């Protein structure tokens, strides 16, 4: 939209003269009447209709929050509460482990989802003797809170409450490859102190780019001694395996009440009702699934999901989340090795009747369904899982090894890192390599983490494709150090989703859309600089589609530059024809492609950015251009950011420190946006 201020050439004195001549007595009466009516309307008007705000990330909350977690703690005799902000389940898992630890010190703990409680109740926590609030807070995206911690974050920002007497500790979960490392954990720790709460142990900062599990164990083994010293308590014994859930086998149950993979409401896949979100995904039909690349070494694919009649709305730059299923071959092998009938209908019921979490996953269900849709069986299990399963190893040496890997000793940590993490051993591989380890399948299901949704940058614009969401992904497959071939859960599952389906059946994908801040500028005339090697090009396909659509509507569109990178032009140049067409029509002003393996010396996107430094600086400094980076966070995003800093320093010209500050200010102003992963 252009500016609405128009210079008519009328002077101030002329305007005053006109006003004097125009305002007669009649005009004044009418003017007074209008003012009176407006005043009446503002005072007595009804509440205006609510306007949906699409820029805010929508979250799924409980319909009624518990009135007081403090009252619940009093009622159940607990004095430690561990809140978790979790997007992938890891922070929730850590919170459960900490709450379970409490019994060793004569204390009782509970893990809690902040979305289910009123956190203003924190001020009442000192009413409980030796009370402690622990916060396991993950940072999502570019310094954002997780969905379930959004309300808590908003409350902290606005809170004007005295938390004197509240004792707390924070462990943050983040990734150092991201610009805002552990922003949420750091903010919660600092803000609670500002509100008067007392920190009883140092902030822990876990790094998922390194070894998050080891970071947590190291913090945890120092945290509990600090708790003991502060409250004057002592450990009552060694860590023990205490079951949280009891197994109930259903021998004669109506199949109509058995979960078959639904994430929330029973039979929700048979009777779909909006709104659709993480707890109520939409079953989208796969209408297109085509290979994008020519090479045989990797499989890069483009999928289109039909969202007609779902009322799902998305914008360019949003993410689509899909719930995958584990490979049936792995599930069958687990059943075989444990000698279990996977089709037994069962429930795992929480032994703590006061807990808000009645089951670890939707129950009643079958072991087959749980291992296929609800449990993560492909990632290396964490140390607490190894510790609890060790008791079922009949061979002493195997039991000793498992307990050692679960210990906090240097030797144990090193063994766990090399034998489990670096070798990418999942639970089936561990059972295969330790023949005497045969845990009951119900205990295994209790300890395994939940299978999480996978997020992809949407590769389409809703202006052009309002009834479909497009995905661009590369199938993950690699050989481990132990010689096994591991496959990506979601990408392998998506690859098999043929549009026609088997026997004419439709291929369905449970999905929902997560709003993002990765947005095109409000003004279409603003130049955009997009950098996206590999599948990082995905959101930019949507951006370019939208700008092409705006041009077709007769709108003026600013320069649109894409810096794309791949290995070879004849191997993995994604969307080659589409990009060429956009470039030919002028929707894509400049298309610069770096081929890393097509010549003796490797060429990456940052080399092309340096080549165009003068033009880029003009667009950024004079044209107010917005910069977008999508792809690998560990190397590419960092190198590209350094390249922009070099360009700013050289073209400014200015000192390097000033250039770094210049780029960071672009980020603060929303002119340098990242959609990256590690």
From Swiss-Prot:
Bilayer topology annotation: Single-pass membrane protein
Binding site for NADP(+): 298, 535, 596-597, 602-606, 639
GO terms assigned for molecular function: flavin adenine dinucleotide binding; FMN binding; NADP binding; NADPH-hemoprotein reductase activity
Domain FAD-binding FR-type: 279-521
Chief localization: endoplasmic reticulum
InterPro entries in UniProt: CysJ-like_FAD-binding, FAD-bd_FR_type, Flavdoxin-like, Flavodoxin/NO_synth, Flavoprot_Pyr_Nucl_cyt_Rdtase, Flavoprotein-like_sf, FNR_nucleotide-bd, NADPH_Cyt_P450_Rdtase_alpha
UniProt modified residues of type N-acetylglycine: 2
UniProt binding sites for FAD: 424, 454-457, 472-474, 478, 488-491, 677
PROSITE patterns hit by this protein: FAD_FR (PS51384), FLAVODOXIN_LIKE (PS50902)
GO biological process: nitric oxide biosynthetic process; response to hormone
Parts of the chain on the Cytoplasmic side: 44-678
Source species, domain of life: Eukaryota
Residues in the Lumenal compartment per record: 2-22
CC per GO annotation: cytosol; endoplasmic reticulum membrane
Alphabetical UniProt keywords: Acetylation, Endoplasmic reticulum, FAD, Flavoprotein, FMN, Membrane, NADP, Oxidoreductase, Phosphoprotein, Transmembrane, Transmembrane helix
Domain Flavodoxin-like, residue spans: 80-224
Cofactor, free-text remark: Binds 1 FAD per monomer.
Post-translational modification Phosphoserine, affected residues: 63
Subcellular location per the Swiss-Prot or TrEMBL entry: Endoplasmic reticulum membrane
Binding residues for FMN: 86-91, 138-141, 173-182, 208
NADP listed as a keyword: yes
Cofactor requirement: FAD; FMN
Catalysed reactions, as listed in the record: 2 oxidized [cytochrome P450] + NADPH = 2 reduced [cytochrome P450] + NADP(+) + H(+)
Summary of the function given for this chain in its UniProt record: This enzyme is required for electron transfer from NADP to cytochrome P450 in microsomes. It can also provide electron transfer to heme oxygenase and cytochrome B5.
Family under the similarity heading: Belongs to the NADPH--cytochrome P450 reductase family. In the N-terminal section; belongs to the flavodoxin family.
Protein name: NADPH--cytochrome P450 reductase
Species, as recorded: Sus scrofa (Pig)
UniProt lineage: Eukaryota, Metazoa, Chordata, Craniata, Vertebrata
Gene encoding the protein: POR
């Amino acid at each position: 939209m252009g500016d609405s201020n128009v210079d008519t050439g009328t002077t101030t004195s002329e305007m005053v003269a006109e006003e004097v001549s125009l305002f007669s007595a009649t005009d004044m009466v009418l003017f007074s009447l209008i003012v009176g009516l407006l005043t009446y309307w503002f005072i007595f008007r009804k509440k205006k209709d609510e306007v949906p705000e699409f820029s805010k990330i929508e979250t799924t909350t409980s319909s009624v929050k518990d009135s007081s977690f403090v009252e619940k703690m009093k009622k159940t005799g607990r004095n430690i509460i561990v809140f978790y902000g979790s997007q992938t389940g890891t922070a929730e898992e850590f919170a459960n482990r900490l709450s379970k630890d409490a019994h060793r010190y004569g204390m009782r703990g509970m893990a809690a989802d902040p979305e289910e409680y009123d956190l203003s109740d924190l001020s009442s926590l000192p009413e409980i003797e030796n009370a402690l609030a622990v916060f396991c807070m993950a940072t999502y995206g570019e310094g954002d809170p997780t969905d379930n911690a959004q309300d808590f974050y908003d409350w902290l920002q606005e809170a004007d409450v005295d938390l004197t007497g509240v004792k707390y500790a924070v462990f943050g979960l983040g990734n150092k490859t991201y610009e805002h490392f552990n922003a949420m954990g750091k903010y919660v720790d600092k803000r609670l102190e500002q509100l008067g709460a007392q920190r009883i142990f140092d902030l822990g900062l876990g790094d998922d780019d390194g070894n998050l599990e080891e970071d947590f164990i190291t913090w945890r083994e120092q945290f509990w001694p600090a708790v003991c010293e502060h409250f004057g308590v002592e450990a009552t014994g060694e860590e023990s395996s205490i079951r949280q859930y009891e197994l109930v086998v259903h021998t004669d149950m109506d199949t109509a009440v058995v979960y078959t993979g639904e994430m929330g409401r029973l039979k929700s896949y048979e009777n779909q009702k909006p709104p659709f979100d993480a707890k109520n995904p939409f079953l989208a039909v796969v209408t297109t699934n085509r290979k994008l690349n020519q090479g045989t070494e990797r499989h890069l694919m483009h999928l289109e999901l039909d969202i007609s009649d779902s009322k799902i709305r998305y914008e360019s730059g949003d993410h689509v989340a899909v719930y995958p299923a584990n490979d049936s071959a792995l599930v069958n092998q687990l059943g075989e090795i444990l000698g279990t009938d996977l089709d037994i209908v069962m429930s795992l019921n929480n032994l703590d009747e006061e807990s808000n979490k009645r089951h670890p996953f939707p129950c009643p269900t079958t072991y087959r369904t749980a291992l296929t849709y609800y449990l993560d069986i492909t990632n290396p299990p964490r140390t607490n899982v190894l510790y609890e399963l060790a008791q079922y190893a009949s061979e002493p040496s195997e039991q000793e090894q498992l307990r050692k890997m679960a210990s906090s000793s240097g030797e144990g940590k090193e063994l766990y890192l090399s034998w489990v993490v670096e070798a990418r051993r999942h639970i089936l591989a561990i059972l295969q390599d330790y023949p005497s380890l045969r845990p009951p399948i119900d205990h295994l299901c209790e300890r395994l983490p939940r299978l999480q949704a996978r997020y992809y940058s949407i590769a389409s614009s809703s202006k052009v494709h309002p009834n479909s969401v497009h995905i661009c992904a590369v199938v993950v497959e690699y050989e481990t150090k132990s010689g096994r071939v591991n496959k990506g859960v979601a990408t392998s599952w998506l690859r098999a989703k043929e549009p026609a389906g088997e026997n004419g059946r439709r291929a369905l994908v449970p999905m929902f859309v997560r709003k993002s801040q990765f947005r095109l500028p409000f003004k279409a005339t603003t130049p955009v600089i997009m950098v996206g090697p590999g599948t990082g090009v995905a959101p930019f396909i949507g951006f370019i589609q939208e700008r092409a659509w705006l041009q077709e509507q007769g709108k003026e569109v600013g320069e649109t530059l894409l810096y794309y990178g791949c290995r070879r032009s004849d191997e993995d140049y994604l969307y080659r024809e589409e990009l060429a067409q956009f470039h030919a029509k002028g929707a894509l002003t400049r298309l610069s492609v770096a081929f890393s393996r097509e010549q003796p010396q490797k060429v990456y996107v940052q080399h092309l950015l340096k080549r165009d430094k003068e033009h880029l600086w003009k667009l950024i400094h004079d044209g107010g251009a917005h910069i977008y980076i999508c792809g690998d966070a560990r190397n590419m995003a960092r190198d590209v950011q350094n390249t922009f800093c070099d360009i700013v320093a050289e073209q400014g010209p200015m000192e390097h420190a000033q250039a770094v500050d210049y780029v960071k200010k672009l980020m603060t102003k929303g002119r340098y946006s990242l959609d990256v992963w590690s």
